[in-house]
From Swiss-Prot:
Regions annotated as coiled coil: none
The protein's name in its UniProt record: Islet amyloid polypeptide
UniProt entry keywords in alphabetical sequence: Amyloid, Hormone, Secreted
Subcellular localization: Secreted
Protein source organism: Sus scrofa
Function of the molecule: Amylin/IAPP is a glucoregulatory peptide hormone that plays an important role in the regulation of energy homeostasis. Selectively inhibits insulin-stimulated glucose utilization and glycogen deposition in muscle, while not affecting adipocyte glucose metabolism. IAPP function is mediated by the CALCR-RAMPs (AMYRs) receptor complexes. Amylin can also bind CALCR receptor in the absence of RAMPs, although it is more selective for AMYRs.
Domain notes: The mature protein is largely unstructured in the absence of a cognate ligand.
Length: 32
């Protein structure tokens, strides 16, 4: 249960990081 919650938070964090940082550094990696 704890691992699932942590995984969802991590996935959400990575998703926002891709949207924000990914667009700045390399937009091509956003699709990966």
């Amino acid at each position: 249960n704890m691992a699932t919650c942590a995984t969802q938070h991590l996935a959400n964090f990575l998703d926002r990081s891709r949207n924000n940082l990914g667009t700045i550094f390399s937009p091509t990696k956003v699709g990966s």
